[in-house]
């Protein structure tokens, strides 16, 4: 049995992963602003916490839970994402900040907060995007989103190098 933290669990990939891991017998901490979809399932292996990832005070709820209930984290899946679709010339600094708060800063902050709970063999998977690899040329209107997804690719590569001696793995899934 693993202890798995997943962000962005109200729908889509995060919602499905939470159920799949729980059904396989793993303990899942499901983080989302909207916890109702997973609460309806009422799975004994899923704990939900309402978290706004762009709010550091909310992130502290996660560490408090882990300290009290789990003591360790085997897997972190950074799945939550924020997308603003506008032509580049229409994007504001506030648009970029909004996207980066969820897609980059929250990934970095949550990962940093959970590092003390990782052990040899722990794994961090961050969901990126092909837009982060190929850029906005193939994804017009997604300059803020794609550049943020590119940033977490680089961040994950750097963390993989920094934590290789502790045998904590960092990977990206670009969809």
Identify the residue ranges that each predicted region occupies:
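Conserved Rossmann-fold SDR core element
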Residues: 74, 153, 163-175
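Conserved glycine-rich cofactor-binding loop
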Residues: 10-11
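Conserved NAD(P)H cofactor-binding loop of Rossmann-fold oxidoreductase domains
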Residues: 79-84
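Substrate-binding pocket helix/loop in short-chain dehydrogenase/reductase
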Residues: 87-88, 95-97
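Active-site helix of classical SDR
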Residues: 111, 145-148, 156
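Alpha-helical segment proximal to the catalytic Tyr-Lys
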Residues: 116, 161-162
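Residue(s) in the substrate-gating loop at a strand-loop-helix junction
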Residues: 129
């Amino acid at each position: 049995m693993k202890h798995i933290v997943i962000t962005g669990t109200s729908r889509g990939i995060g919602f499905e992963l939470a159920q799949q891991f729980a059904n396989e017998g793993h303990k899942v901490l499901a983080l989302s602003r909207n916890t109702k979809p997973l609460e309806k399932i009422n799975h004994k292996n899923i704990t939900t916490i309402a978290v706004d990832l762009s709010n550091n005070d909310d992130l502290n709820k996660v560490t408090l839970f882990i300290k009290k209930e789990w003591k360790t984290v085997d897997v972190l899946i950074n799945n939550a994402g924020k997308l603003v679709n506008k032509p580049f010339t229409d994007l504001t600094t506030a648009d970029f900040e909004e996207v980066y708060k969820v897609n980059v800063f929250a990934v970095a902050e949550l990962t940093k907060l959970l590092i003390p709970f990782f052990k040899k063999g722990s794994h961090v998977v961050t969901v990126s995007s092909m837009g982060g690899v190929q850029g906005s040329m193939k994804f017009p209107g997604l300059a803020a989103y794609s550049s943020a997804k590119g940033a977490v690719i680089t961040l994950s590569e750097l963390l993989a190098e920094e934590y290789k001696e502790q045998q904590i793995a960092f990977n990206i899934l670009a969809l």
